[in-house]
C-alpha cells in the first residue's frame, strides 16, 4: 500500500493538487520530494494503540485529510483531530470493508465497530472505492455518504513487455495468506491437471502469520514438489523480469481489494487468470483476462486456458485496457475531480 500511496500522491501533484504526507517521525524535519511535502508527526502508544500526537498542527490550512486502510486506531485518532479543527476527512479503506474481511475475527471486529469504527465511517465526508460494485460493501455498514470511484493506477517501466513466456512458469505474487489469496485452491487445481499437462508454478511473496509453512505442507501432501516452487518477495527490476518471463500469471483470491500484481502483469501483456473480484471482473468484461470461479476445478480449467493460443490475444487486450483506463495520471485526475466537487 505504501508504494500506491506514493504514486497516488505524485500523480495528484502533477494534476495540480498540493499534497502533504504526514508520517510517523520523531524530531525529524520535513522535506519535499516529487512535489510532495513529507511531514514527520510524533506518535505515542505501542502496537495497535499507536496514534499521532498533535496532528491538529499538521492539519492547519488543509482542505481534506485522507485516511488510508481501516480497522486502525491511528485512523480513529486522526479523524478526531480533523473534526476538532473542522477539516473534513475521506476514507480510503482499500477493500478493508469487504464482507469477507469484516467476518474475519468477527467478534473483535464487532467490538471495534461499536467502540470506534462506526463513528469514523458515519462522520466521513466521503469514501473512496475502486469500483462501483464495492458500493454494497459500504452500504451494508450503514454508510450513506458520498463515494469517490477510481481504481489504482499502473505504469510499468519503459521497455518492459511480456516475452512470450521464456521462463516456462505460471507466476503468482502476493502475501502468503492461504485462505484470503486462495493458494489452497490453486494448489488443488494444479494437482487436478494431468501430469503431462501440469504447469510449473512459482509463488513469490512475504509470509503472513505462518502462511508459507501452511502452503509448503500442502504442496508436500499433494505431491506437487516437482511443479511448485516457493520464493521470497521480489521488488523492482527483479519483479518485472520475473513477470515478463512468465508463461502466465494467476490470482486465485477468494476476495480482494484491488490486486496490484494483477494490474502489473496485465499491463505488460502477460496472460492472466483471475477470480471474480472487482478488478478481475472489470478486466474480464473487457476481454483482458481469463476468469474462473474460486474452486479447484474451475482454476484447473483456467490454468489450462492460459496456454491456449487465445490467451495471448486476451493478454494484449488487457494491456490496452490498462493503458487506456488505469495510468496513474488518468486515475489521479478522476479522483481529484470527484473529490473537489465534494468540497
Language model: regions and residue ranges:
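Aromatic "clamp/platform" in nucleotide-sugar-dependent glycosyltransferases that forms part
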Residues: 254
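Conserved acidic donor-binding segment of nucleotide-sugar-dependent glycosyltransferases
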Residues: 289-297, 304-310
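Carbohydrate-associated surface elements
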Residues: 133, 153
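Glycosyltransferase donor-sugar binding loop
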Residues: 22-28, 173, 199-215, 232
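Short hydrophobic beta-strand element within catalytic cores of glycosyltransferases
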Residues: 271-275
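Conserved donor-binding/catalytic core segment of Leloir-type glycosyltransferases
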Residues: 128, 161-181, 187-190, 202
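Membrane-proximal helix-turn-helix segments that form the acceptor-binding/catalytic region
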Residues: 97, 109-127
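Nucleotide-activated donor-binding/catalytic signature segment of Leloir-type glycosyltransferases, i.e.
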Residues: 213-234
Amino acid at each position: 500500500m505504501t508504494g500506491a500511496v506514493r504514486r497516488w500522491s505524485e500523480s495528484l501533484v502533477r494534476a495540480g493538487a498540493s499534497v502533504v504526507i504526514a508520517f510517523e517521525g520523531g524530531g525529524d524535519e520535513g522535506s519535499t520530494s516529487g512535489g510532495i511535502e513529507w511531514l514527520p508527526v510524533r506518535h505515542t502508544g505501542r502496537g495497535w494503540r499507536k496514534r499521532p500526537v498533535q496532528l491538529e498542527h499538521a492539519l492547519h490550512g488543509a482542505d481534506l485529510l485522507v485516511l488510508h486502510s481501516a480497522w486502525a486506531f491511528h485512523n480513529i485518532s486522526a479523524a478526531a483531530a480533523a473534526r476538532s479543527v473542522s477539516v473534513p476527512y475521506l476514507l480510503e479503506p482499500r477493500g478493508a470493508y469487504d464482507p469477507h474481511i469484516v467476518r474475519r475475527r468477527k467478534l473483535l471486529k464487532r467490538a471495534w465497530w461499536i467502540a470506534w469504527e462506526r463513528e469514523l465511517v458515519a462522520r466521513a465526508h466521503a469514501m473512496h472505492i475502486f469500483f462501483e460494485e464495492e458500493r454494497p460493501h459500504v452500504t451494508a455498514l450503514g454508510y450513506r455518504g458520498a463515494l469517490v470511484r477510481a481504481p489504482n493506477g499502473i505504469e510499468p517501466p519503459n521497455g518492459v513487455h511480456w516475452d512470450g513466456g521464456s521462463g516456462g512458469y505460471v507466476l503468482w505474487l502476493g502475501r502468503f495468506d492461504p485462505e484470503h489469496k486462495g493458494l489452497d485452491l490453486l494448489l488443488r487445481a494444479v494437482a487436478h491437471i494431468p501430469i503431462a499437462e501440469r504447469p510449473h508454478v512459482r509463488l513469490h511473496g512475504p509470509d503472513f502469520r505462518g502462511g508459507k509453512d501452511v502452503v509448503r505442507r500442502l504442496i508436500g501432501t499433494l505431491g506437487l514438489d516437482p511443479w511448485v516452487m516457493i520464493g521470497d518477495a521480489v521488488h523492482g527490476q527483479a519483479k518485472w523480469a520475473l513477470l515478463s518471463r512468465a508463461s502466465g500469471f494467476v490470482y486465485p483470491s477468494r476476495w480482494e481489494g484491488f490486486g496490484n500484481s494483477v494490474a502489473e502483469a496485465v499491463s505488460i501483456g502477460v496472460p492472466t487468470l483471475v477470480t471474480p473480484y472487482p478488478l478481475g471482473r472489470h478486466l474480464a468484461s473487457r476481454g483482458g483476462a481469463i476468469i474462473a470461479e474460486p474452486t479447484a476445478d474451475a482454476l484447473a480449467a483456467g490454468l489450462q486456458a492460459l496456454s491456449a493460443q487465445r490467451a495471448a490475444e486476451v493478454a494484449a487486450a488487457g494491456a490496452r485496457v490498462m493503458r487506456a483506463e488505469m495510468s496513474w495520471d488518468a486515475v489521479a485526475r478522476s479522483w481529484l475531480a470527484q473529490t473537489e466537487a465534494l468540497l
